[in-house]
């Protein structure tokens, strides 16, 4: 009789727990619909989306919906969690929050790769995986870039527009074809790619500017604008101020104070820098 009572209590507890989980799941689905409604607006309120994402993350943890918990999840649960985190990754880009983007992508890769046999392919999968590749390039994490690339089918690498874009950029960087990298900004597969490609272009500009400072005693304003791939004089002026360049007589930037003294020079760095810039010019003419 005691055993029967215990079993009855256990059964009641189990059914009560299931009912509670069902109620929380229903609440999570409702919160997701609110998030999706705000996110799909022409100009979403990013602060409101962030608050919704924060609440949903707590709910997902409570329901053990995240793939790191080891809980066996249903298809419906997995899709709900994946969809929420896809919005989170895209929201992170608009907020320019790189650590947040990286965290969301770490979770999403579990859904894209570990559960690929159980789930229908997400419409945003290739876009976000391509964004992740571009993120790694922008951070100069080339080894990780190739590790992530190895997880993708050869067909996607060769034909998918979202994956091909960062792959092409990496090839241009390996070749030193910086002009092609700058031209690629006008051919991005999605607006969200702008954030990371701008970071990459800023890094390239800094490298070219460093070469200019070592290779030239002075350079004409218009020449610097062209070499650094600026399309307006104002952008060139703003960049020059950031680097501490001062525009002097006859519209020249002077770098005499940054030149190496002959006796301190152990390698022909000035000549090498000039060759690099001349090579970039020749590539620009070819394109």
Swiss-Prot record:
Tell me yes or no: is Ion transport among this UniProt entry's keywords.
no
Q: Which residues carry this modification: Phosphoserine?
A: 43
Domain PCI, first and last residues per copy? 99-268
Supply one GO CC term from the record. Answer: cytosol
- Keywords attached to this entry: Isopeptide bond, Phosphoprotein, Proteasome, Ubl conjugation
Covalent link location (Glycyl lysine isopeptide (Lys-Gly) (interchain with G-Cter in SUMO2)): 234
- What biological process terms from GO does the record include? proteasome-mediated ubiquitin-dependent protein catabolic process
Q: So which domain of life are we looking at?
A: Eukaryota
In terms of PANTHER family, this protein maps to:
26S PROTEASOME NON-ATPASE REGULATORY SUBUNIT 8
What does this protein's UniProt record list under function? Component of the 26S proteasome, a multiprotein complex involved in the ATP-dependent degradation of ubiquitinated proteins. This complex plays a key role in the maintenance of protein homeostasis by removing misfolded or damaged proteins, which could impair cellular functions, and by removing proteins whose functions are no longer required. Therefore, the proteasome participates in numerous cellular processes, including cell cycle progression, apoptosis, or DNA damage repair.
Give the UniProt family note. Answer: Belongs to the proteasome subunit S14 family.
Record note on quaternary structure: Component of the 19S proteasome regulatory particle complex. The 26S proteasome consists of a 20S core particle (CP) and two 19S regulatory subunits (RP). The regulatory particle is made of a lid composed of 9 subunits including PSMD8, a base containing 6 ATPases and few additional components. Interacts with DDI2. Interacts with TASOR.
Name of the protein this chain belongs to: 26S proteasome non-ATPase regulatory subunit 8
Q: What would be the name of the gene that encodes this protein?
A: PSMD8
């Amino acid at each position: 009789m005691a055993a029967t009572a215990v079993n009855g209590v256990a059964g009641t507890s189990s059914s009560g727990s299931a009912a509670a989980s069902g109620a929380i799941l229903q609440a999570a689905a409702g919160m997701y619909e609110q998030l999706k409604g705000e996110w799909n607006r022409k100009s979403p309120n990013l602060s409101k989306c962030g608050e919704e994402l924060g609440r949903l993350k707590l709910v997902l943890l409570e329901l053990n919906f995240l793939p790191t918990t080891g809980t066996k999840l249903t298809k419906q649960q997995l899709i709900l969690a994946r969809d929420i985190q896809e919005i989170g990754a895209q929201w992170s880009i608009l907020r320019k929050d790189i650590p947040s983007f990286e965290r969301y992508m770490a979770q999403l890769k579990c859904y894209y790769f570990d559960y690929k046999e159980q789930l229908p392919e997400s419409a945003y999968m290739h876009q976000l995986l391509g964004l992740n590749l571009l993120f790694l390039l922008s951070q100069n994490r080339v080894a990780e870039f190739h590790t992530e690339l190895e997880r993708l089918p050869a067909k996607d690498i060769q034909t998918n527009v979202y994956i091909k874009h960062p792959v092409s950029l990496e090839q241009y960087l390996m070749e030193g074809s910086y002009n092609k990298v700058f031209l690629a900004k006008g051919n991005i597969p999605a607006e969200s790619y702008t954030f990371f490609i701008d970071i990459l272009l800023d890094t390239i500009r800094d490298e070219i500017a460093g070469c200019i400072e070592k290779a030239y005693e002075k350079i004409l304003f218009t020449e610097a604008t062209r070499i650094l791939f600026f399309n307006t004089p104002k952008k060139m002026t703003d960049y020059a101020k950031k680097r501490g360049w001062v525009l002097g007589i006859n519209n020249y930037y002077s770098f005499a104070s940054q030149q190496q003294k002959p006796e301190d020079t152990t390698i022909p760095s000035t000549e090498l820098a000039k060759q690099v810039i001349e090579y970039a010019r020749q590539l620009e003419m070819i394109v």
